[in-house]
Amino acid sequence: MQKTSILIVALVALFAITEALPSLPTTGPIRVRRQVLGGSLTSNPAGGADARLDLTKGIGNPNHNVVGQVFAAGNTQSGPVTTGGTLAYNNAGHGASLTKTHTPGVKDVFQQEAHANLFNNGRHNLDAKVFASQNKLANGFEFQRNGAGLDYSHINGHGASLTHSNFPGIGQQLGLDGRANLWSSPNRATTLDLTGSASKWTSGPFANQKPNFGAGLGLSHHFG
C-alpha cells in the first residue's frame, strides 16, 4: 500500500511538472488522422527475425494528440505471438499511456505509464517516466512491477534508457539499455543498429547474482 501511494504521488508530481513547463506552440487546428498500417522486421542473433505488425489511428496534431494502436509481435522462427493494444495521450512531449498485452502460454501484462519531456533541442531528447504494471504468468503466479526511468534519444537514431524497477515482495532491479545506429537508408526506413543491455538486482533473493549483460547487431526495416 505504501509503495502504491508513493507511485500515485510521483504521478501527480509528474503531471504538476508537465503543467508548469511551457507548452510548445501548436501547428494548427486539431484534425483526425487516417488509420496507418505499419510494422517492422528485425534480425535476431538467436534465430529468425522479430516481426511486428500494428494498426494505428491518431486524433490531433503532432504536438497534442490521442493515439490508439493494436499490434501483434513475435519471432518468425519460434515462440508465441504477443498481441495487445495501447491508448496514449501526448501534449507537447508530456503524456500518459495504457498498454495491455497477451502472450499465449506465457503471461498477460497491463501497464500504465506517464512521461514528461525534460529537454529537446531538435537533436537531443530526454524524457522522464514513471510506470506500474500488473503481470500474470500462465501458471497463475501474479506479481507487480513499478518504477521510474530516463530515456535519451538522438536525431540520428542513437539512444539509451536507465530504469529502476521495484517488484514488491521480490526485490529491486536496475537496468541500462543502449542503441547506436551504424547505418540508415536515406528515408530511415531501414537501419543497422548495435544494441547493448545490462541489469542487476539491487535487493531481494537475487541480489547476490552477477549482472546480466547482452549485446546484439540487428538490421531493421520499418514500413507504413
From Swiss-Prot:
Superkingdom assignment: Eukaryota
Positions annotated as propeptide: 21-34
Tissue spec. comment: Hemolymph (at protein level).
Keywords: Antibiotic, Antimicrobial, Cleavage on pair of basic residues, Immunity, Innate immunity, Secreted, Signal
Residues spanning the signal sequence: 1-20
Gene Ontology CC, one term: extracellular space
Pfam families: Attacin_C, Attacin_N
UniProt subcellular location: Secreted
Keyword Secreted assigned: yes
Any single biological process term in GO: humoral immune response
Keyword Manganese found: no
Induction description: By bacterial infection (at protein level).
Family, similarity comment: Belongs to the attacin/sarcotoxin-2 family.
Annotated function: Hemolymph antibacterial protein.
Protein name (database record): Attacin-A
Protein source organism: Drosophila melanogaster
